[in-house]
UniProtKB/Swiss-Prot annotation:
Alphabetical list of HAMAP family matching this protein: PSII_PsbT (MF_00808)
Membrane association type: Single-pass membrane protein
Phylogenetic lineage: Bacteria, Bacillati, Cyanobacteriota, Cyanophyceae, Oscillatoriophycideae
Annotated gene: psbT
Protein name: Photosystem II reaction center protein T
InterPro entries in alphabetical order: PSII_PsbT, PSII_PsbT_sf
Amino acid sequence: MESVAYIVVLTMALAVLFFAIAFREPPRIQK
């Protein structure tokens, strides 16, 4: 079960990075 927790932590880290970049730069992708 350690692998599951590791994947969850990685996913959360990627989400934090994505949101940090998305909110730092002006929104260009709008559909």
